[in-house]
Design a protein with these regions (language model features):
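Acidic, glycine-rich two-metal-ion catalytic cores of nucleic acid-processing enzymes
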Residues: 5-10, 21
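Right-hand nucleic-acid polymerase module
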Residues: 206, 225-282
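A conserved non-catalytic segment of reverse transcriptases
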Residues: 98, 174-242, 246-248
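Residues immediately flanking
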Residues: 17, 61-63, 156, 197, ...
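Conserved polymerase palm-domain catalytic core
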Residues: 26-38, 42-191
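Short acidic (Asp/Glu) and glycine-rich catalytic loops that position anionic groups and cofactors
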Residues: 23-27, 55-57, 71-74, 105-108, ...
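Electropositive, glycine- and tryptophan-enriched low-complexity nucleic-acid-binding patches
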Residues: 13, 17-30
Length: 282
């Protein structure tokens, strides 16, 4: 992450607010990341809509090191196409992208890529990939994009493989982005993972649920809090409060998914861990 200084952050925030106000309405309705009044849950619900309409072959697109490979000249060109022509603004955006990284006490300027961690990064990522969104729209494809996570939905495996090959070529030729040959794949919904969710069919209808990796992360976070309490002799009340925050946050994020059975199993595990802690105090 490229964490900007206070002054840089203020300038970036000012530019980001102006760009968002000017450009957000021009972005694709199928782009959900880093945009006002949009969320990951809305993106996942849109994927469910496609799948239940019969577009149940998924192209799970993986752009290699997206933020590290954004082409500066191409980005400035796209901004000009969107009537962002103020020379001072464009100069500041380019300076931000070229801020570089510190290695062995020396600053190495960046020739490509966008530093992550600043207020400008999200809007710039959407500006750059909006070209891709419009290309998919022009082709009449069903897709959902959240930042650099993009899934495309079609009705047959043959179409999916053809589209995957075509959009991979387009991204490399037009936006100079490399698509991972090993991570990009054509799958059925049950094998697809998007924003921490996967899919299952219940009574003839597709539903979403937390992926196994997402479930394991919840276990790991709670387990670490319980172990950490022992290591630093933290009060049991503080530990329970922190675990409650983790669990409530997790459930809130995955609230649109099927998870009753998992929550029951997880609850039993957590109650057992808590009982052990309480017994050890006596």
């Amino acid at each position: 992450l490229g964490i900007p200084t206070v002054v840089d952050r203020v300038i970036q925030q000012a530019i980001a607010q102006v760009l968002m106000k000017k450009l957000d309405s021009s972005f694709s309705e199928f782009s959900y990341g880093f945009r006002p009044r949009r969320s990951a849950q809305m993106a996942v619900l849109k994927t469910l809509e496609y799948i239940n309409e019969g577009y149940d072959w998924v192209i799970d697109l993986d752009i290699e090191a997206y933020f590290d490979t954004v082409n500066h000249d191409k980005l400035i060109s796209i901004l000009r196409e969107k009537n962002v022509n103020d020379s001072t603004t464009l100069h500041l955006i380019r300076k931000f992208m070229q801020a570089g990284i510190m290695e062995d006490g020396l600053v190495k300027p960046s020739r490509i890529g966008v530093p992550q961690g600043g207020p400008l990064s999200p809007i710039i990522s959407n500006v750059y990939l909006d070209k891709f969104d419009k290309e998919l729209e022009n082709r009449g494809l069903r897709f959902v994009r959240y930042a650099d996570d993009c899934n495309i939905f079609v009705k047959s495996e043959m179409s999916a493989n053809r589209v995957m090959k075509s959009v991979t070529s387009w991204l490399e030729r037009k936006l100079f982005l490399k698509v991972s040959a090993t991570k990009t794949k054509v799958v059925r919904p049950t094998k697809s993972k998007f924003l921490g969710f996967t899919y299952l069919k219940m009574n003839g209808e597709w539903k979403c649920k937390p992926s196994n990796q997402s479930k394991m992360k919840l276990y790991d976070k709670c387990r670490k809090e319980l172990v950490r309490r022992i290591g630093i002799a933290r009060s049991i009340a503080v530990t329970f409060r922190r675990i409650n925050q983790i669990v409530v946050g997790w459930i809130n994020y995955y609230r649109i998914g099927v998870m009753k059975y998992f929550i029951d199993v997880f609850g039993q595990w957590l109650r057992h861990k808590i009982r052990v802690i309480i017994l050890k105090q006596w």
